[in-house]
C-alpha cells in the first residue's frame, strides 16, 4: 500500500478512536475487521502509528499547533487527525524522510494542500516545547495531564517524576519464549527479521 494511503488510514482510525467511547483496542479491532484488504504489514503500521499518537497526544498537539501557525484556520477535522499522526512519526519517531507527495494525496482541504511542504519543514526542525512552568513542561513533554504531574511532583520530586512519566509512557517490550524442541532462538529471530521485526535476546533468560 502507498505511504499516503497508510497515513490516511492511520488518521481515519485515530479520529474513530478519539470520537468513540469504546476502548481504543476495541475500535481498532473493528476497524481492521471492516478493512480486510489491509495486509499484515499495513495493519502493523496503522496500529503502531495510532497507538503511538495516542500515547504522545498532548505533545503532538503542541508541536502541530506551532507548525501550523495561521494555517490551522484552513484545516478540517479529518486533516487534523491525519497531521497528528504525521507529527508523531516526525516528532517522536524521528522519521524525517517525508515528501510532500507522500502527504498531499491524503489531505482533503484544498486550502491546506499548498502549505504541506512548509508544515513538514517546520515539523522536521528541532522544537522545544513552549511552557516554562514545570508542571506544564513535564505534562507536554510526556503527554500527561497537569493534575497528575502536579501530584507526582508533590510525592516524588522533579527528577523521579520525569523518570516515572518517561517510563510509564514508553511502549512495553514483548518477551517471547522459544520451544527448543521445535525451533531454536536463532531460527525464530530469523523468521521475525523477515517480517521486519527486530529482536534481541533477553538478559535474564538468554537460552
Listing of model-derived features with the role each one plays in the protein:
Residues 1-207:
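Class I Rossmann-like S-adenosyl-L-methionine
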Amino acid at each position: 500500500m502507498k505511504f499516503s494511503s497508510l497515513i490516511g488510514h492511520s488518521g481515519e482510525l485515530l479520529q474513530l478512536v478519539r470520537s468513540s467511547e469504546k476502548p481504543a483496542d476495541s475500535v481498532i479491532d473493528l476497524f481492521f475487521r471492516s478493512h480486510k484488504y489491509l495486509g499484515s504489514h499495513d495493519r502493523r503500521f496503522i496500529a503502531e502509528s495510532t497507538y503511538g499518537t495516542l500515547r504522545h497526544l498532548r505533545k503532538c498537539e503542541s508541536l502541530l499547533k506551532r507548525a501550523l501557525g495561521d494555517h490551522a484556520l484552513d484545516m478540517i477535522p479529518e486533516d487534523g487527525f491525519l497531521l497528528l499522526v504525521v507529527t508523531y512519526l516526525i516528532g517522536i519517531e524521528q522519521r524525517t524522510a517525508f515528501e510532500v507527495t507522500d502527504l498531499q494525496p491524503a489531505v482533503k482541504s484544498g486550502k491546506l494542500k499548498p502549505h504541506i511542504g512548509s508544515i513538514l519543514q517546520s515539523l522536521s526542525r528541532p522544537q522545544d516545547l513552549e511552557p516554562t512552568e514545570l508542571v506544564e513542561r513535564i505534562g507536554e513533554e510526556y503527554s500527561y495531564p497537569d493534575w497528575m504531574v502536579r501530584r507526582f511532583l508533590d510525592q516524588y520530586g522533579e527528577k523521579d517524576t520525569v523518570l516515572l512519566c518517561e517510563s510509564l509512557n514508553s511502549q512495553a517490550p514483548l518477551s517471547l519464549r522459544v520451544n527448543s524442541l521445535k525451533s531454536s532462538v536463532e531460527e525464530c529471530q530469523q523468521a521475525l527479521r523477515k517480517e521486519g521485526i527486530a529482536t534481541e535476546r533477553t538478559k535474564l533468560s538468554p537460552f
